[in-house]
């Protein structure tokens, strides 16, 4: 698949997601038919002359997700998340998007960023089709430590969000790694942060 064609498909997917979901609807509640349409666009199956392709053709040896969250008032909200999915393939463009979330604290929003990014990847590729490692990067050391079992999660709301993510990642045949990196330390993390802030009307300098 040529780079130009790949970019067009990913933009089409992002547009489909934006049109289909409102700000509060969990991506995992999307309909089967809608997901099949997303897969067709992603794989080029919407064009008759392309022929069948495997989902694995979308990505390389590892998928990297960089995600971040932003909240105008902590606690209180409103809040938004942004994430960038890098398929580690030269001719495959990154998928980036942002959305509002219902989180009322920064830590809740950071968990939501990870959950929605993983959900989007699974909805796009189909969980059973993802066979390469997934590296999820966040700039929240607390959240990463809680997901990795390094620190306890005493807050009931955060514990529920953590368990949902662990259940989601545990359902995949591929391994999921939760990694910490400092704020804006990579172009992808900065992009994720900028997208979330832009959605909230925060100007980036």
Which residues are covered by each model-predicted region?
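Flexible loop/turn and low-complexity linker elements, especially glycine-anchored beta turns
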Residues: 31-51
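Short, basic/hydrophobic alpha-helical segments
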Residues: 112-135, 168
């Amino acid at each position: 698949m040529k780079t130009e064609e790949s970019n067009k498909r990913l933009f089409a997917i992002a547009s489909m997601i934006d049109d289909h979901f409102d700000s509060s609807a969990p991506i995992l509640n999307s309909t089967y038919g809608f997901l099949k349409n997303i897969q067709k666009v992603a794989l080029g199956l919407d064009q008759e002359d392309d022929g069948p392709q495997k989902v694995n053709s979308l990505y390389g040896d590892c998928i990297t997700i960089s995600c971040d969250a932003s909240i105008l008032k902590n606690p209180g909200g409103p809040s938004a998340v942004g994430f960038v999915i890098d398929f580690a393939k030269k001719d495959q463009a990154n998928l980036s998007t942002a959305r509002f979330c219902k989180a009322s604290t920064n830590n809740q929003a950071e968990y939501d960023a990870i959950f929605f990014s993983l959900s989007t990847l699974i909805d796009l590729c189909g969980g059973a089709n993802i066979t390469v490692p997934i590296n999820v990067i966040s700039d929240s050391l607390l959240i990463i430590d809680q997901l990795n079992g390094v620190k306890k999660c005493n807050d009931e709301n955060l514990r529920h969000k953590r368990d949902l993510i662990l259940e989601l990642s545990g359902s995949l045949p591929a391994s999921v790694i939760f990694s910490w990196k400092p704020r804006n330390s990579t172009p992808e993390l900065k992009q994720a942060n900028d997208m979330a802030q832009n959605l909230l009307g925060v100007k980036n300098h």
